[in-house]
C-alpha cells in the first residue's frame, strides 16, 4: 500500500485530482471501452472535485467516456433534497464537467425494493467491466462509505443502519439537528470497493489521525474498515501532515523517503 503525505489539504486535493486525470488520460477511454470511476461524497473529496473541474475546463481531461458509480446514498431523502448525495454530486461536480448524465450511477435511496436496487447496482458495475479506480474518504472511526465499524470486509452493496457517531457527524449538514439526519443508507460494501482495480483514499485533518494510524500500522480489522485496504494490490492513501499525528516516526519517514519523487502533484501530469 502506498502512502502519499502532502503538506496540507490543498496539495492533497491537487495530487488526488492529478492522479485521477492521469489515469483517465492513460486509459484513453472510448464509448465502447469507458473508464469506470467510483466516487465519494463528504468534505474530503471537495478539493479534488474543484481541481478536476479546472482540469476539465482547461482541456487536460475529459469525462465524456467516463462512467461513475457513487459509494452511497441516504434512504428516504428525496433526490432533490439539498443534502442528498444526488444533489451533492451534481452541485459540486457533475454539472461543471462534460460527463454524460446517462453515465452517472447513484444508488436510489427511494427505491420501492432497496435490496433489488443494491443487487442491480452490483450488476451494473459488473456489466461495464468493473471499477477501474475507486476514490474514497474515511470517517474518524475509519469507516469507508457507510461501512461502519463491525462491517464485514467482504460485504457487498446493501442497506446499512448509521451509527450515532455518524449521525452526529452528519448533523452539521442538517442544521445541527440529529433528528433530521436519515438513520439508514444504501452503500457499496467493503468487498465492492476492494473489487476495483485501484483504490485511492483521501485522509485529512487531526481528527482522522487515529484512523490513518490504524489503516497503515494496524492489523486488518472489521472495527476499522479502512484497514481492508491493506489487502488490495493497488491501494493508495493520500493524506496531509495533520492526519499523520499518530503515525510512528519511523513509518512517517519511511513513506516520505520512498515516495519523495512522487509527492509533487505536477509529477503526475506530464
Swiss-Prot record:
Record-listed E.C. numbers: 3.5.99.6
Activity regulation (record text): Allosterically activated by N-acetylglucosamine 6-phosphate (GlcNAc6P).
GO biological process: carbohydrate metabolic process; glucosamine catabolic process; N-acetylglucosamine catabolic process; N-acetylneuraminate catabolic process
Keyword Hydrolase applies: yes
Pathway: Amino-sugar metabolism; N-acetylneuraminate degradation; D-fructose 6-phosphate from N-acetylneuraminate: step 5/5
GO annotations of cellular component type: cytoplasm
Name of the protein in question: Glucosamine-6-phosphate deaminase
Lineage, top ranks: Bacteria, Pseudomonadati, Bacteroidota, Bacteroidia, Bacteroidales
Gene: nagB
Amino acid at each position: 500500500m502506498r502512502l502519499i503525505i502532502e503538506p496540507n489539504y490543498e496539495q492533497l486535493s491537487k495530487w488526488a485530482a492529478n492522479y485521477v486525470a492521469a489515469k483517465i488520460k492513460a486509459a484513453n477511454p472510448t464509448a465502447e471501452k469507458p473508464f469506470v470511476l467510483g466516487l465519494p461524497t463528504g468534505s474530503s473529496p471537495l478539493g479534488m472535485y474543484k481541481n478536476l473541474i479546472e482540469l476539465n475546463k482547461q482541456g487536460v481531461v475529459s469525462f465524456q467516456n467516463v462512467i461513475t458509480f457513487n459509494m452511497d446514498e441516504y434512504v428516504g431523502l428525496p433526490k432533490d433534497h439539498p443534502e442528498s448525495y444526488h444533489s451533492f454530486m451534481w452541485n459540486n461536480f457533475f454539472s461543471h464537467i462534460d460527463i454524460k448524465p446517462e453515465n452517472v450511477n447513484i444508488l436510489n435511496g427511494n427505491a420501492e425494493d432497496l435490496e433489488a436496487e443494491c443487487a442491480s447496482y452490483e450488476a451494473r458495475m459488473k456489466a461495464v467491466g468493473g471499477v477501474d479506480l475507486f476514490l474514497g474518504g474515511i470517517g474518524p472511526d475509519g469507516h469507508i462509505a457507510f461501512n461502519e465499524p463491525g462491517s464485514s470486509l467482504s460485504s457487498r452493496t446493501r442497506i446499512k443502519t448509521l451509527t450515532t457517531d455518524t449521525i452526529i457527524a452528519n448533523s452539521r449538514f442538517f442544521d445541527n439537528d440529529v433528528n433530521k439526519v436519515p438513520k439508514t443508507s444504501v452503500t457499496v460494501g467493503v468487498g465492492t470497493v476492494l473489487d476495483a482495480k485501484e483504490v485511492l483514499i483521501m485522509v485529512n485533518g487531526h481528527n482522522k489521525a487515529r484512523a490513518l494510524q490504524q489503516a497503515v500500522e494496524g492489523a486488518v480489522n472489521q472495527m476499522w474498515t479502512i484497514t481492508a485496504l491493506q489487502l488490495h494490490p493497488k491501494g493508495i492513501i493520500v493524506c496531509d501532515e495533520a492526519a499523520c499525528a499518530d503515525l510512528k516516526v519511523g513509518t512517517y519517514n519511511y513513506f516520505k523517503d520512498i515516495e519523495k519523487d512522487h509527492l509533487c502533484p505536477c509529477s503526475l501530469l506530464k
